[in-house]
UniProtKB/Swiss-Prot annotation:
This is Pentatricopeptide repeat-containing protein At1g22830. Pfam families: PPR (PF01535), PPR_2 (PF13041). Residues 595-671 are annotated as: Type E motif. The gene is PCMP-E24. The lineage of its organism: Eukaryota, Viridiplantae, Streptophyta, Embryophyta, Tracheophyta. Belongs to the PPR family. PCMP-E subfamily. Keywords: Repeat. InterPro entries: Pentatricopeptide_rpt, PPR_At4g14850-like_plant, TPR-like_helical_dom_sf. Residues 671-703 are annotated as: Disordered.
Length: 703
């Protein structure tokens, strides 16, 4: 009798050998009543036993069902009773995760000659697939002479569930070679496998087969095709499929909306959402989460926030995924007010209990990114049993706000609580040492990482080390870490390129960018910001212009506001003020105040009052800056051009901001002020040790 699921299937054995696997209880039952002695009442015995068997199966009484089956197979002369009973028992064994009885039953089926019956084969394939014995399941499928696609569908689906996508495609090809026609259940599975493998060529082959079949307009097949072409980035093909569909469900709409959000075409995604409502299909929480997630991925944080707020206004239940999306959006744009609204929803609702840890961690991150460390720590304190991820969230929050003393204190507290830092903890701390200029501590953590074998291939950690050294100006150390890495990704290269760019070594940065391309690593929008910034700092106008113009067509990266800002800085540093102004005319976004201030300062340096006054008006009237340095630049430009009425307006605004005297409109010298960076005011007292007694400070206690 087999003892473990690892035993191979019973094949290639003699009947006598197979009988060894059949339980003795099945062999010791009395022989069936002879035909000559049967009465009219005796003829109903098999039916009574079969009904009893079905009762045991329906009530989950597996072993009682097996005992009844033993009686049934000896008392019944009907082949179908035994066949369908065996099929039911195999399904029940799967439901109860009982491998040994199921394998014993398979042995009985082999000895009875039922192994390749069309009813039993799909059940056997399902049984072995459920125990991850996929090779055995495939052997049964291929040895059967059944021309129905059902067992093949089960096998393909099992390979996909086990992430063995290549094998699932191979099974499909084998199925086709046997002349078995795929059905509406086969195609969605193999399409999913092609998408997972990014096998565009064979995906098109499967699509071609569908086009000449009767399943061309099947709802589930079309939905799978749309998702596949989304994976391939072929939004236009997906849209044509969607438009020709005579029937659409919520999955269809979600799939096509997801296509546009993944390509950062959010305007079209919102149009489709409106069409979805007009067509009578109600947008589910999946639809909203798809759009919000796409907005986050595209960097459209205001759009993501609007999605979550829209869910609330449309009375759509906000689940944990939507709440986390909303809190992430608030974190990125500093929307503390909305973050507190979401916090109140968390307090009042019980729908987040199953994922409360992730929601709380997102709350801590949101408050930290909005520089409200007091409330971040309140949320942290109210967690009854802190997990490692919760410790990581609060430590990362204080590190982000450059509170080195509190970060060190929290790290010690975490160690005292019995938690050891993992790669996420260390990756969140390392950037702090570059920002506060405490590279010695960073080197100590570098040694800590080197001493632990478990961090040897942790890419995120080594990327953080490269970034720490690069941002500290220690480019040789950054390069040394880079060279020691066995695996690199776009983050690794981006950190190194940014480091060389900061030091004014634009040619070297471009050389590493080319090396990245040769290595087959595709850059993203952050990489392009680093490269353009390197060109700007090294006055590489021609190279920067080429990269900017070819970004979408050559690298497949959509131009973002940051890229336009880099080009304005590049042209301004080189004195090409006309080209810098042209950027404002072509940009599809609302220009930032930092971009206007960059052009304004360049005009003051180069004495171009014409473009300077235009930039000043744009800065004052359209972008409405909140940074003091920008107002000082405005005042200087209006003083130079003699625009006294506008100068008075600026002085009034400065007065409203509480500035009494500002060096008589002196130019601001620091780059950080020109770039519009927010200097976060830090309280000298430790946030951790502050009293938290007021009602406002205890937001988490408010209903």
């Amino acid at each position: 009798m087999p003892s473990s699921p690892s035993r191979s299937i019973l094949r290639g054995l003699t009947v006598s050998e197979i009988c060894k696997f059949i339980p003795q209880s099945w062999k010791q039952l009395p022989r069936p009543i002879s035909e000559t002695s049967k009465t009219h009442d005796d003829e109903s015995v098999p039916q009574v036993l079969f009904n009893s068997f079905r009762h045991c199966i329906s009530h989950g009484q597996l072993y009682e069902a097996f005992r009844t089956f033993s009686l049934l197979r000896y008392q019944s002369g009907s082949h179908e009773f035994v066949l369908y009973s065996s099929a039911s028992l195999l399904s029940t064994c799967v439901g109860f995760n009982e491998f040994v009885p199921g394998q014993q039953l398979h042995a009985h089926c082999i000895s009875s000659g039922l192994e390749f019956d069309s009813v039993l084969v799909p059940k056997l394939v399902t049984f072995y697939s459920a125990f991850n014995l996929l090779d055995e399941a495939q052997t049964i499928t291929e040895n059967s002479e059944i021309l129905h696609p059902l067992p093949w569908n089960v096998l393909i689906g099992s390979y996909i569930r086990n992430k063995r996508f290549q094998e699932s495609v191979s099974v499909y090809k084998r199925m086709m070679s046997k002349g078995i026609r795929a059905d509406e259940f086969t195609y969605p599975s193999v399409i999913k496998a092609c998408a997972a493998l990014l096998d565009f060529a064979y995906g098109r082959v499967v699509h071609g087969s569908i086009e000449v079949s009767s399943h061309r307009c099947n709802l589930y097949v079309c939905n799978a095709l749309i998702s596949m072409y989304k994976r391939f980035g072929k939004v236009d093909v997906a849209r044509r499929l969607f438009d020709r569909m005579s029937e659409r469900d919520a999955v269809s709409w979600n799939a096509i909306i997801n296509c546009y959000t993944s390509e950062e075409k959010l305007g079209e995604a919102f149009k489709l959402l409106d069409r979805m409502y007009l067509s009578g299909v109600e947008a589910s929480i999946v639809t909203w989460n798809t759009i919000a997630g796409g907005c986050l991925e595209a960097g459209n944080y205001i759009g993501a926030l609007n999605c979550v707020v829209g869910m609330r206004n449309c009375n759509v239940r906000i689940g944990s995924v939507a709440m986390i999306n909303g809190l992430k959006a608030c974190s990125h744009i500093g929307a503390l007010k909305w973050g507190k609204v979401f916090h109140c929803l968390v307090i009042r609702s019980c729908s987040f209990s199953h994922d409360i840890d992730n929601v709380r961690n997102s709350l801590i991150t949101m408050y930290s990114r909005c520089s409200d460390l007091r409330h971040a720590f309140i949320v942290f304190q109210q967690v009854e049993a802190n997990s490692l991820s919760t410790w990581n969230s609060i430590i990362s929050g204080f590190a982000y706000n450059e509170r080195s003393e509190e970060t060190s204190f929290l790290l010690k507290e975490m160690l005292l609580s019995g938690f050891h830092p993992n790669h996420i903890t260390l990756a969140s701390i390392l950037p702090l040492f570059a920002r506060v200029g405490n590279l010695q501590h960073g080197k100590e953590f570098h040694c800590y990482i080197l001493r632990r074998q478990s961090y040897k291939d942790c890419l995120i950690l080594w990327n953080s080390l490269v970034d720490m050294y690069a941002k500290s100006g220690e480019i040789i150390a950054a390069k040394r870490v880079f060279d020691s890495m066995r695996k690199r990704d776009k983050v690794t290269y981006t950190s190194l390129i940014d480091g060389y760019g900061r030091l004014g070594k634009g040619e070297v940065a471009l050389a590493w960018f080319k090396d990245m391309d040769r290595s087959g690593i595709k850059p993203d929008h952050v990489t392009m910001v680093a490269v353009l910034s390197a060109c700007s700092h090294s006055n590489l106008v021609r190279e920067g212009h080429w990269l900017f113009t070819k970004m979408e067509h050559v690298f497949g990266i959509r131009l973002r506001l940051e890229h336009y800002s880099c080009m304005v800085d590049l042209y301004c540093r080189a004195g090409y003020l006309d080209k810098a102004r042209d950027i404002f005319h072509t940009i599809p976004y609302e220009p930032s105040s930092a971009m206007c201030a960059t052009l304004l300062k360049a005009c003051l340096i180069h004495g171009n009052t014409n473009i300077g006054e235009w930039a000043a008006d744009k800065l004052l009237l359209e972008t409405k800056p909140e940074h003091l340095g920008h107002y000082m630049l405005l005042a200087d430009m209006y003083a130079v051009t003699g625009s006294w009425s506008k100068l008075v307006t600026v002085k009034t605004l400065l007065s409203d901001l509480g500035v009494q005297k500002a060096h008589e409109f002196a130019l601001m010298e620091t780059d950080s002020e020109l770039d519009g960076e927010n200097n976060k005011p830090m309280n000298d007292d430790s946030v951790i040790n502050q009293e938290q007694s007021s009602d406002e400070e205890r937001l988490v206690e408010v209903g």
